[in-house]
Amino acid sequence: MTDQKAVATRLAPLGFAQAPAHAHLNLPPAALVEQALRRGEGVLTDTGALMADTGAFTGRSPKDRFIVRDATTNDAVWWGDINIPFDADKFGKLHQKMVAYLAEKEIFVRDAYAGAHPATQLKLRVVTELAWHNLFCYNMFLRPETGADTSWLPDFSIICAPGFEADPAVDGTRQKNFAVIDFTRKLILIGGTGYAGEMKKGIFGVLNFLLPHQHDTLSMHCSANVGAAGDTAIFFGLSGTGKTTLSTDPNRGRIGDDEHGWLPGEGGIFNFEGGCYAKVIDLSAAKEPEIWNAIRFGSIVENTRFVPGTHTVDYANKSVTENTRTAYPIYFIPNAIEPSVAGVPKNIFFLTADAFGVLPPISRLDKSHAMYHFMSGYTAKVAGTEMGITEPQTTFSACFGQVFLPLHPTKYAEMLGHQLEANPDVTVWLINTGWTGGAYGTGHRMKLAYTRTMITAALSGVLSEVQFKTHPIFGVAVPGAVPGVPSEILDPRTTWADKAAYDQTASELAERFIKNFEKYADFASADILAGAPRVAAVPA
């Protein structure tokens, strides 16, 4: 039986005059699953996971994400299409309407943390309309120790009510769904959408503002692992670059898979989260056993469907969305490190799937190149062939997570540069998991085994003993040899039958980098700009 006084105490700072008649506080996973089943929010799979649908929205809605523009944010936030301003008074009225809506509902309240390092940890309070959303928060945020006093005043709170829809004409939203962050009130309002990832990414956005702005701590959209010797590695990469696959290593402990912070000086890195939110489209036990085995009682699978006549999930089924996901606590992974903190990274990997076949499969970056490529956040995607479009499409996402950055990308890039200066033993690598021997359509995808071998070589330190040469256009340092990898694939130009075509394609890709960077030119330092490619013909 929930202590209504304890609930009322927790809800008062969030604007609730009194607790709703049916309010649940910090229910354990089994009780939340029970509530979700009772309320018809989901069904159990044959492995015991809770399968739930997110409704009309099967992903984030970036055009409906807002930040309140006030004295706290006006001069700090990078305003534009990503960080859309919202009126403070309208936020206050929207907040009141949501509280009134939830006052008549059965609600679920949870206390949690964000950030595994005590120096920057946020105390969270989450109010959800749905039981399975509360289970999502249990899985994804950091969990207080059993018996801990969590009657705190939260550092940030979330109110999430998918059943509450805004009136755009009155409330200042674009449409009925919304996610609005108010840094002064320390509150996120989410309504009209059942996509649970809005809560996770809402707090990520909060940390991406607070940590660099107030704690001199670099926030990063990356995965991280650590070796037996305590050597930490972090992996950046957009969708399709192999970030999850390459950062998952049975010989290395998992720190986290998506969101991390890097404390100043020798402070090291830490996970923001307490769980994993992994894509499961076409999931198989053979390809990703770690994720497969984590989908059990206590886990959530979103927007999936059963094999007809069974309770077995058909992971190939895309009838709802390709963005099918699972959410589970990090301790469901056998080699998870808890607490999720580690030392200063020894190696940093920027992953790109270059479908133009231009970038080396592995190259070392100096500080300027590291900052430039960090700000560029490049990969290339192959367009669908159903319309006859086969040309690769460049994708640039600043800091490998542009849509989550409240501050200007140069802020994060300069912080990375400062960290590299303060920690000169850190090595930054650019890894091309894309094409070799030609662009998409002519060449072929780099073998995963080779990429793994190259990363293992970088982690072991063996590459410090080989000769490097400078790429004539991108300026990165290319190793002449990697143990276990054919040396002829290390220089991308030598893998092309038509050398002139390589030179032309490399120059064209370099021009796309430069064109993308034009919007940052007035803000970027000379140090960052020094990492730009040089557009020039390579001698035959």
What do the PLM-derived regions correspond to, one by one?
Residues 1-150:
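N-terminal accessory targeting/assembly segments
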Residues 3-45, 56, 221-238, 249-250, ...:
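Glycine-rich, often acidic-flanked micro-motifs
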Residues 73-79, 182-187, 393-399:
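Gly-rich Lys/Arg/Thr-decorated short loops/hinges at beta-loop-alpha junctions or inter-strand turns
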Residues 118-121, 167-169, 198-201, 244-245, ...:
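Short helix/loop capping segments that flank catalytic or ligand/cofactor-binding pockets
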Residues 165-212:
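Charged, amphipathic alpha-helical linker segments immediately N-terminal to NTP-binding catalytic cores
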Residues 241:
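ATP-binding Walker
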Residues 245-255:
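A conserved segment at the C-terminal end of the G1
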Residues 489, 494-540:
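Generic C-terminus detector
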